[in-house]
Design a protein with these regions (language model features):
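Short S/T/G/P-rich N-terminal loop/turn motif that feeds into the first structured element of a domain
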Residues: 1-53, 60-71, 83-119
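A short, acidic, amphipathic alpha-helical segment used as a generic capping/interface helix at domain edges
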Residues: 73-80
Length: 119
């Protein structure tokens, strides 16, 4: 299976309304506007009490992830994401391209390669 699932666990200190507004009215529309066909899912889950969240991204393959990352990294929306959230943990289920591995090195992602399963 060539799918790549990216799980980003974050924490935040801003009011939950600010976070939800960013996710729903800025980040999601921005990601959707990039029209990356290989993006299968881009979903947020938030625990308001602990001010933590999880972003799950699923891609058709590693190249699709790299294409979207190239369109997003360094943009104002990406910079705002980095100012609103602290990335506590990034887990990549599947392969990384060499280019993405280099770009994400600072985030210290935990990478787990696919072994098998039922799809």
């Amino acid at each position: 299976d060539r799918h790549v699932t990216v799980i980003i666990d974050v924490s935040f200190s801003d009011d939950v309304k600010i976070i939800k507004d960013f996710v729903l009215n800025e980040q999601c529309p921005f990601i959707q506007s990039k029209e990356e066909e290989g993006l299968i899912k881009f979903e947020w889950f938030i625990d308001e009490e602990t001010k933590t969240g999880t972003l799950i991204e699923v891609f058709k393959d590693p190249i699709s992830w790299e294409k979207l990352a190239d369109k997003v990294i360094g943009t104002p929306v990406n910079i705002k994401f980095n100012s609103l959230f602290i990335i506590e943990k990034m887990t990549v289920l599947g392969e990384l391209t060499d280019n993405l591995e280099e770009k994400l090195q600072a985030a210290g992602p935990m990478v787990k390669n696919y072994v098998g399963g039922i799809n």
